[in-house]
Amino acid sequence: MTCPICGSKTAPSYRPFCSKRCADLDLAKWLNGSYAIPASSEDEEEPLDQEAETPVAPRH
């Protein structure tokens, strides 16, 4: 198996990456929005005002 970032052989402790550096680079891509999981319109949540129609029990 090769590292998806640089193509080097993977290290067991960082699998599927070869090093902490490549793992961190991949995490940074997720955090800055370079990677995204597409959503279909069916997956969209209901607007918040519709969810509020359900009564909420008072807190003690």
Swiss-Prot record:
Zn(2+) binds at residues 3, 6, 18, 22. GO terms for molecular function: DNA topoisomerase type II (double strand cut, ATP-hydrolyzing) inhibitor activity; zinc ion binding. The keyword Zinc applies. Keywords: Metal-binding, Plasmid, Zinc. Binds 1 zinc ion. Its cofactor is Zn(2+). Residues 41-52 have a biased composition (Acidic residues). Residues 38-60 are annotated as: Disordered. GO terms for biological process: regulation of DNA-templated transcription. Inhibits all the catalytic activities of DNA gyrase by preventing its interaction with DNA. Acts by binding directly to the C-terminal domain of GyrB, which probably disrupts DNA binding by the gyrase. Belongs to the DNA gyrase inhibitor YacG family. Interacts with GyrB. This is DNA gyrase inhibitor YacG.
